[in-house]
């Protein structure tokens, strides 16, 4: 069995896309984030796999993420690395392969996600590099917590540091195409047409 893990922030005014909100305002930032959530949801449903949705703050029972398609969870941990580690640990209890994505990459496609899962047949890890030096996706076919430890999240060192850890483990990794996340107004202008 394969599992897609999706990390989202609860869509609340003033709490999402804060860097984007600096130039477009909180309401527009929330509106953009909701579009990204809708895009991510449709993409996830198009795949044949288990889907585990992890909310940042609280599980929302009656939102538009259907309980039929998504197993709902709350993120746990002191930083992003710990939260991802805990999500992978849970997913890999029942799955042979798991891949995690966030909800701010509108360039992500079904084909890229299918390639991510397929590549885990013969490789231990798969990573989708983001243009900002982080990643929009990471996947593994066994639980390896060390790849999430001692990393300065939301910096340009995330990807190189993660690759260094995988090399140290002497494991095989595949890199997917480099895509951009939507963090600021410039990013939004580049991808807005994909969500119209």
Walk through the language-model features, giving the residues of each.
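N-terminal nucleotide-binding beta1-loop-alpha1 segment
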Residues: 1-19
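A short, N-terminal amphipathic alpha-helix
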Residues: 31-49
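Acidic donor-binding segment of Leloir-type glycosyltransferases
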Residues: 46-71
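Short phosphate-binding loop-to-helix
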Residues: 65-97, 155-158, 186
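Short aromatic-hydrophobic micro-motifs that form the base-stacking/packing surface
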Residues: 99-101
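Conserved donor-nucleotide/metal-binding helix-loop-beta segment in metal-dependent transferases, i.e.
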Residues: 106-135
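Short, glycine-/small-residue-rich phosphate/pyrophosphate-handling segment
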Residues: 144-165
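Conserved alpha/beta core of the MobA/IspD/sugar-nucleotide pyrophosphorylase nucleotidyltransferase superfamily
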Residues: 164-196
């Amino acid at each position: 069995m394969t599992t897609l893990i999706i990390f989202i922030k609860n869509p609340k005014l003033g709490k999402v896309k804060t860097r984007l909100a600096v130039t477009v305002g909180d309401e527009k930032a929330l509106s953009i984030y909701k579009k990204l959530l809708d895009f991510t949801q449709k993409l996830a449903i198009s795949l044949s796999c288990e889907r585990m949705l992890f909310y940042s703050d609280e599980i929302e029972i009656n939102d538009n993420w259907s309980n039929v398609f998504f197993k709902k969870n709350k993120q746990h941990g002191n930083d992003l690395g710990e939260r991802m580690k805990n999500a992978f640990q849970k997913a890999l209890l029942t799955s042979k392969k798991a891949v995690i994505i966030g909800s701010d990459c509108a360039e992500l496609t079904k084909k890229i996600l299918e390639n991510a899962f397929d590549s885990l047949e013969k490789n231990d890890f798969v990573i989708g590099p983001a243009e900002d030096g982080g990643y929009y996706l990471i996947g593994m076919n066994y639980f390896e917590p060390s790849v999430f430890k001692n990393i300065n999240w939301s910096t340009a060192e995330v990807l190189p540091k993660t690759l260094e850890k995988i090399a140290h483990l002497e494991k095989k990794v595949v890199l997917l195409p480099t895509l951009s996340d939507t963090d600021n107004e410039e990013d939004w202008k580049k991808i807005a047409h994909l969500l119209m």
